[in-house]
Swiss-Prot record:
Similarity remark: Belongs to the ETS family.
Localization in the cell: Nucleus
A Pfam family annotated for this UniProt entry: ETS_PEA3_N
Provenance organism: Bos taurus
Keywords attached to this entry: Activator, DNA-binding, Isopeptide bond, Nucleus, Phosphoprotein, Transcription, Transcription regulation, Ubl conjugation
PANTHER family for this protein: ETS, ETS TRANSLOCATION VARIANT 1
Function statement: Transcriptional activator that binds to DNA sequences containing the consensus pentanucleotide 5'-CGGA[AT]-3'. Required for olfactory dopaminergic neuron differentiation; may directly activate expression of tyrosine hydroxylase (TH).
Gene: ETV1
A GO CC term assigned to this protein in UniProt: nucleus
Transmembrane portions of the chain: none
InterPro entries: Ets_dom (IPR000418), ETS_fam (IPR046328), ETS_PEA3_N (IPR006715), WH-like_DNA-bd_sf (IPR036388), WH_DNA-bd_sf (IPR036390)
GO MF, any single term: DNA-binding transcription factor activity, RNA polymerase II-specific
Protein name stated in the entry: ETS translocation variant 1
Amino acid sequence: MDGFYDQQVPYMVTNNQRGRNCNEKPTNVRKRKFINRDLAHDSEELFQDLSQLQETWLAEAQVPDNDEQFVPDYQAESLAFHGLPLKIKKEPHSPCSELGSACSQEQPFKFSYGEKCLYNVSAYDQKPQVGMRPSNPPTPSSTPVSPLHHASPNSAHTSKPDRAFPAHLPPSQPIQDSSYPMDHRFRRQLSEPCNSFPPLPTMPREGRPMYQRQMSEPNIPFPPQGFKQEYHDPVYEHNTMVGGAASQSFPPPLMIKQEPRDFAYDSEVPSCHSIYMRQEGFLTHPSRTEGCMFEKGPRQFYDDTCVVPEKFDGDIKQEPGMYREGPTYQRRGSLQLWQFLVALLDDPSNSHFIAWTGRGMEFKLIEPEEVARRWGIQKNRPAMNYDKLSRSLRYYYEKGIMQKVAGERYVYKFVCDPEALFSMAFPDNQRPLLKTDMERHINEEDTVPLSHFDESMAYMPEGGCCNPHPYNEGYVY
């Protein structure tokens, strides 16, 4: 048996043993028939019509009839479980280098249908790049043919009873038109049904044993990870096309998988720098995309504007406090109209235009226009009048803070408790210092240059002797 590498010896031995032991072991014969029947039934279920598929494979792959007798079942099993024997590699034309060159040259070409993952390798090893016909007959030793190609059911009798036959596996899925390039067929079983032995779930795809890829053919010398990553990385695909026959010097799979990671990491770093390392990230990454730079710019200036307007708003709101030392809520501009009225009523000096009537919380606007004018000064609204002030007071009617006394003009009253009123009007017992007429004149300091100009015009006749001095502003010293 050592001198034979095909299926003739298993047939002869099996037939002779049947001739001698048919009467001695009827149980084994029935068992083998049951196994063969089961395997044939499973094969028909998986491949629908085994003979029709075999004729289709042979017709499309242009394989001679004498090539389908040189890959026995026990050899495929020994390749799967005991490693590749060296006798298969002793052949005149090794398909290894031709296969590598074919993969690198036909890489961008894609199939239009997915059944070609089951084709014979010899049909592609020795064919032109465009045509599908082989230029010369393939080498018999390098022609792997599936055991299922044989139409005779005796081929299944040679298998062991406990053999893990691939008939229980589902059929191969068709390859989509735009999913994989043509060399993806070499990642599958070329002449066997796809994935005769399923890969381990815990083992990575690039680290699985090579016999799972092709059982009756020498190993493909380049890593399968390259085929897995080519259609994801167009740059790497272009480099493989240019490589040609030198595709055996592929970079390690780690480098192939690292390229998209570097690109993704480079695209993520600018955003991190724009968030956590503002100025450094903006300066040390001049090659970032325009979107990241645009994101960095508005973020930086937005932070500046967030700080500066707060200061400006604080200064504007603190404008009453520039002339006095008042409470904090007054500087924030939170003084409301009812609080302003309570502050005016609490100051006895304002009794000539607003005062308590002595009937509970009632008060009267003795000079309503003066009250409106002071409220306009407080809110920096020079056009404030009593009509606008009265409309503002109606808002407090709905809120239940104050009411209009019926039958009396300019008389109002607070409807809440006096202690609660003053505690809310003066938090922390801080009386707001209101603006007065003097403060109103101070607020008109914008006209100071005009007054100086008038004074300088008045002193111009007296300063006639000072004409030689080159003072363009007209100041006289």
